Design a protein with these regions (language model features):
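A conserved regulatory-domain signal marking ACT and ACT-like small-molecule sensing domains
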Residues: 311-411
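Conserved active-site and cofactor/substrate-binding residues in soluble primary-metabolism enzymes
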Residues: 7, 11, 15, 35, ...
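Rossmann-fold NAD(P)-binding glycine/threonine-rich loop
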Residues: 81-87, 91, 100-138
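Substrate-binding/catalytic subdomain of NAD(P)-dependent oxidoreductase enzymes
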Residues: 173-273, 278-280
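N-terminal glycine-/serine-/threonine-rich beta1-alpha1-beta2 phosphate-ribose binding loop
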Residues: 1-91
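Catalytic, metal-anchored helix/loop core of enzyme active sites in primary metabolism
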Residues: 146-150, 158-161, 165, 183-190, ...
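Rossmann-like NAD(P)H-binding beta-loop-alpha module
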Residues: 68, 115-197, 204
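A short hydrophobic/small-residue beta-strand
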Residues: 94-96
């Protein structure tokens, strides 16, 4: 019998326990042996819980019990989770986690520890929640050189942007609804709306694609706080919707570019129709072409189901999974992983006339005129040209309020 310990009994941790109880027979059959939770580590009081006898507050009890084969980490963050996970791997116990911050920051180190101590470190739920993406990329797409990953990986901001489009709501109104429904944190929604959550996820996928650690701090990241109802209306005029896009590209020379940013997505693009709390990740392979992974990116039971699937994988395959699921350590690079390629852009400027905007930005057209400025569609520009245009706008007493890249239609 395989004994399991769960670290943290919040939304995901309690979901893992529920999945293991409700689907015990199927999980055990697939794992090849009975699977049972022996410990649940959490500092809170669960004396009234039906499984009260499983709760402990001493982490060392798990390390000292030779019966525990797999540890599920759902604490979140890195302050406690990282040392706990490190200790478990060093003791030869496999770890399954949904902790994107830990994987994005310490993934290479923890993968190496798993290899060194003949166990597994698995994290399917860290990117897609309940939507499989890690396993398909390192197993099913193993015959491909992956050149690009692009997608919607944060359900909260996608829900908010959907509300802003469908109901003509402002950012604050959409955020309030997301908080009331439990999609966004009430105290500090910054991880979602400022793009940090999406940044960690694309850092993990970039590390997997490139074979070495890509750090979140090297990925240019912008959230959706600056998006207004006027921008949503302008996007509609251009035949687009606004989505928070996480992306990475790998050049033929091995160069890497990555980013998280709100973008104009043409309605013909596959990502344009991904609404509400759903996520979608488009992966480009040199042999397969484009493949899209779609589903709910969060939620108690969807995320827990991915964690439990990792538990089964750890019990069946152990360290063998790291024949394909692995990346090397690397130091953070200097600067940001920007993409030098030109693209079409939407810019919103204040304090200058439309004719002046046209003279500064070049070939394109005015989308909307405002009382104190305009929005302008630039047919083609790169980062250098946009920066130079912004300097000219500011020199004339104006300001650039928003810049959105437009994705191609055929993605």
């Amino acid at each position: 019998m395989a004994k399991i310990a769960i670290l943290g009994f919040g939304t995901v941790g309690s979901g893992v326990y529920e999945v293991l109880c409700r689907n015990a027979a199927g999980v055990s059959r697939r794992a090849g042996e009975p699977v049972e939770v022996k410990y649940i580590l959490d500092p809170k009081d669960f004396s009234d819980h039906p499984a009260a006898q499983l709760f402990i507050k001493n982490f060392d009890a798990i390390l000292e019990d030779p019966e525990v084969k797999v540890v599920v980490e759902t604490i979140g963050g890195t302050r406690f989770a990282y040392p706990y996970v490190k200790a478990c791997l060093e003791s030869g116990r496999s770890v399954c986690t949904s902790n994107k911050e830990m994987v994005a920051t310490y993934g290479a180190e923890l993968l190496a520890l798993a290899r060194a101590h003949n166990c597994a470190f698995l994290f399917e739920a860290s990117v897609g929640g309940g939507t499989p993406i890690i396993t398909p990329m390192h197993q099913c797409l193993a015959a491909n050189v992956i050149t690009e990953v692009e997608g919607i990986v944060n359900g909260t901001t996608n829900f908010m942007l959907t509300k802003m489009v469908r109901e003509n709501l402002g950012f604050d109104e959409a955020l309030k609804i997301a908080q009331e429904l439990g999609y966004a944190e009430t105290k500090d929604p910054g991880d979602d709306v400022d793009g940090r959550d999406a940044c960690r996820k694309i850092a993990i996928l970039s590390s997997l694609v490139c074979g070495h650690q890509i750090y979140p701090q090297n990925i240019p990241t912008r959230g959706i706080r600056d998006i207004t109802v006027d921008d949503v209306a302008a996007a509609e005029k251009l035949g687009c919707v606004i989505k928070l896009i996480a992306w990475m590209k790998r050049g033929e020379d091995g160069s890497v570019a990555a980013g998280v940013e709100p973008c104009l997505v043409p309605k013909a693009n596959q990502l344009a129709g991904v609404d509400d709390v759903f996520n979608a990740v488009l992966v480009k392979g040199d042999m397969l072409g484009d493949v899209v992974f779609y589903g709910k990116g969060a939620g108690k039971l969807p995320t827990a189901s991915a964690v439990v699937a990792d538990v089964v994988d750890a019990l069946k395959n152990g360290v063998k999974v790291h024949d394909s699921l692995f990346w090397q350590p690397a130091e953070p690079v200097e600067g940001m992983l920007t993409d030098p390629a030109p693209a079409a852009y939407y810019v919103c400027v204040e304090g200058i006339a439309p004719a002046v905007a046209e003279a500064i930005y070049g070939k394109g057209h005015v989308v909307e005129e405002h009382f104190d400025g305009c929005s302008y569609f630039v047919d083609s520009a790169d980062d250098k040209a946009l920066a130079e245009a912004a300097r000219k706008v500011e020199a004339m007493g104006g300001s650039v309020k928003l810049v959105l890249r437009r994705l191609p239609e055929d993605a």
